[in-house]
Amino acid sequence: MVEIDLNKDGTGVITKISPRKNYLSRKAPKIKGASFRGERLEQIIAANIDQLFIVTSIKHPEFNNKVVDRFIVASESSSITCNIIINKIDLDDTKTSLKWKAIYQDIGYKVFLTSTLSRHGFESLSQSLKGKINLFWGHSGVGKSSLFNSLYPSLNLKVGLISSFNQKGKHTTVTNYLIKVEKDTYIIDTPGIREIDPYGIHRRDLGHYFKEFSEFTSGCKFSTCTHNHEPGCMVIEAVQSGKISEIRYNSYLRILETIEDDIIF
């Protein structure tokens, strides 16, 4: 983050550059110029963040816990406080959002159920933002811009539509924006993304970023246990006994399968 003094002609001079205390990143998208020797490079999303809000929707597009867990891994690996927003709950006829809220709250994450139609959850969400730099990150079409416009009507951000064919949103934000919304309160609006692969995560370390595993990993027979197939794995035993959510564990295995070693510069 930088501070600037504006000149009368609209130009500015940087007067201060804040030291970087943290940053959030992912593997760069699979596009030309975003790789080195065939390996995808690191793409920094934002720095000096107080907390992350993973924005999802219960429908249109459908809630995808495996994607949420990838966002969480990226956040945990950067030691950034992580929260989850499940938006569009006015479409949730079966109350599925309550099931997901329970799963993630039991682990220790704050979960906000929101609706821009009824303004459900807005008061508690607004209070959580105050006095902080808040990064909002999520798939295209989950309603980030609509949330911002409802929380802070003066923003008047562009809102996109959802494709009825593939349930994917269209990008309405094309770059990151740091927006001051109140005294000492900022939001970082990011473009909706189609894929999220955490950067710099090794197979042996992935379990550290599933915080419900921590109670059991010290009891594993092998110090290099990946909690996948090894005998004497206490994480697997905890899943089998219901102490760890099987849904979360299956998500862990899915991420484990896709991890490749990254080139670290």
Where are these regions (language model features)?
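Short amphipathic alpha-helical segments
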Residues: N65-V68, T96-L98, N149, Y199-I201, ...
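Canonical P-loop GTPase G-domain recognition
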Residues: T81, D90-V142
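Well-ordered alpha-helical segments embedded in enzymatic catalytic cores
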Residues: V67-R70, S124, S251
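Phosphate-binding glycine-rich loops and their immediate beta-loop-alpha structural context
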Residues: L41-D50, V55-G108
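Signal for well-folded cores of large energy- and translation-related assemblies
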Residues: S57, I72-E76, D90, T96, ...
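Helix-rich effector regions associated with P-loop NTPase G domains
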Residues: M1-G10, K16-I45, Q51, I80-C82, ...
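Walker A/P-loop
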Residues: S140, S145-S146, S150
